[in-house]
């Protein structure tokens, strides 16, 4: 049996197993089918919109069929990108050669896309979230719910904030998060993978069939090729999803220097420890087991450090000596390497809180990216990592201290 056949057989077995054992996949109906909209149309935004639109089309008892996707309007050979998507049913710039469902409608008008939505899925580079949310204030249903697929933090005078919390604060709607070992091209090609959705049921929950809950979110995102686990640890998966991009830059540096797999593994080991420490230090409500049990944790870290935009950018930085910003422009076709922004935000917060010495890898990535510290200094910058402090952090959690 070929490897592809074995993988397909494994996926079928897992799908059948979930049908038998997962109560969240039981039949769910809504009093009024939910309208779903997606904000963002990059490769990951378009991929998630594809997943969602496939499910809304198959489940009329739960969702309205049409899914609107907000597209930042740009011209492709003189034709608006939204028009191309709606005519060819492909996002020729950010997700070429992938057919999109005909019930997925591209819309360059942000308010028209979101004003009637019951579920809003945010999937844009996180540095643009503020201006997008500002436009949406007072223009959406007050009863809407949201899921953020963004990776990063909002850093301000009051400290570091989860992007899902930022959406809730600014729009007054409950917002969860989606994160996992999900390279967009592989999901778009329907290669089997898994992800984690985290959502906290709000105090104003209206009841089964009247509001969004874990079962509804499972039905919205789960596909035979895209397995979903729904939990309530929004903080945990958000932290892991943001910080893995910083670790991936470190892996890209050592890859570009030609140091091999051993060096990349060392970066990932140190990085995982710092991710857990960051969560316990600044978001004590996060759960340690999320980092090693969920796709959004160590699985996503491994995948991101094996490929993806952040590794590509950092590798090219090491090979050419160019800045991250320049490499991003050169090779990413208008997309972003989120680690470049996140490492700066994390540095700003750690510096203001006096904790830079507690996170030597995060600080090293920042210093290399923005302060011209030679990449060859990376091993010496992280070799004094206090492993005992990370171990104590995990141990104290397990003991309930």
From Swiss-Prot:
Keyword Mitochondrion: no
Keyword set, alphabetical order: Cytoplasm, NAD, Oxidoreductase
Active site: 244
SUPFAM superfamilies (alphabetical): 6-phosphogluconate dehydrogenase C-terminal domain-like (SSF48179), NAD(P)-binding Rossmann-fold domains (SSF51735)
Entry binding sites for substrate: 151, 309-310
The protein's Enzyme Commission number: 1.1.1.8
GO biological process: carbohydrate metabolic process; glycerol-3-phosphate catabolic process
InterPro entries per record: 6-PGluconate_DH-like_C_sf, 6PGD_dom2, G3P_DH_NAD-dep, G3P_DH_NAD-dep_C, G3P_DH_NAD-dep_euk, G3P_DH_NAD-dep_N, NAD(P)-bd_dom_sf
PANTHER family, sorted: GLYCEROL-3-PHOSPHATE DEHYDROGENASE, GLYCEROL-3-PHOSPHATE DEHYDROGENASE [NAD(+)]-RELATED
Name this polypeptide is given: Glycerol-3-phosphate dehydrogenase [NAD(+)] 1
Species assigned in the record: Zygosaccharomyces rouxii
Upper taxonomic lineage: Eukaryota, Fungi, Dikarya, Ascomycota, Saccharomycotina
The gene coding this protein: GPD1
């Amino acid at each position: 049996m070929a490897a592809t056949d074995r993988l397909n057989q494994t996926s079928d077995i897992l799908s059948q197993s979930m049908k038998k054992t997962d109560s969240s996949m039981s039949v769910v109906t809504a009093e009024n089918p939910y309208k779903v909209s997606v904000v963002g149309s990059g490769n990951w935004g378009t991929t998630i919109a594809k997943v969602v639109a496939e499910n809304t089309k198959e489940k009329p008892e739960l969702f309205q069929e049409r899914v609107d996707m907000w597209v930042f309007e740009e011209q492709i050979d003189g034709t608006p990108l939204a028009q191309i998507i709606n005519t060819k049913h492909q996002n020729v710039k950010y997700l070429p050669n992938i057919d999109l469902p005909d019930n997925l409608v591209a819309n360059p008008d942000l308010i028209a896309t979101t004003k009637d939505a019951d579920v809003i899925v945010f999937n844009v580079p996180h540095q643009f979230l503020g201006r997008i949310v500002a436009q949406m204030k007072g223009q959406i249903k007050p009863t809407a719910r949201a899921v953020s697929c963004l990776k990063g933090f909002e850093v301000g005078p009051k400290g570091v904030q989860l992007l899902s919390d930022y959406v809730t604060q600014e729009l007054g709607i409950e917002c969860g998060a989606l994160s996992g070992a999900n390279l967009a091209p592989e999901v778009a090609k329907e290669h089997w993978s898994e992800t984690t959705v985290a959502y906290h049921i709000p105090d104003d929950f209206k009841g089964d069939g009247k509001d969004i809950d874990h079962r509804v979110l499972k039905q919205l995102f789960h596909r035979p090729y895209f397995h979903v686990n729904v939990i309530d640890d929004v903080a945990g998966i958000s932290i892991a999803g943001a910080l893995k991009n910083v670790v991936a830059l470190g892996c890209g540096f050592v890859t570009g220097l030609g140091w091999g797999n051993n060096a990349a593994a060392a970066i990932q080991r140190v990085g995982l420890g710092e991710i857990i420490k960051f969560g316990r230090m600044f978001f004590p409500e996060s759960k340690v087991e999320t980092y090693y049990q969920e796709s959004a944790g160590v699985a996503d870290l491994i995948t991101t450090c094996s490929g993806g935009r952040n590794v590509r950018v950092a590798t090219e930085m090491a090979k050419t000596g160019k800045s991250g910003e320049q490499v991003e422009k050169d090779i990413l076709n208008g997309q972003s390497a989120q680690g470049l922004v996140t490492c700066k935000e994390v540095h700003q917060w750690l510096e203001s809180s006096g904790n830079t010495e507690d996170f030597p890898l995060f600080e090293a990535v920042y210093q290399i990216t923005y302060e011209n510290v030679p990449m060859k200094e990376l091993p010496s910058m992280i070799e004094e990592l206090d492993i005992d402090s990370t171990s104590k952090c995990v141990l104290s959690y397990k003991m309930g201290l």
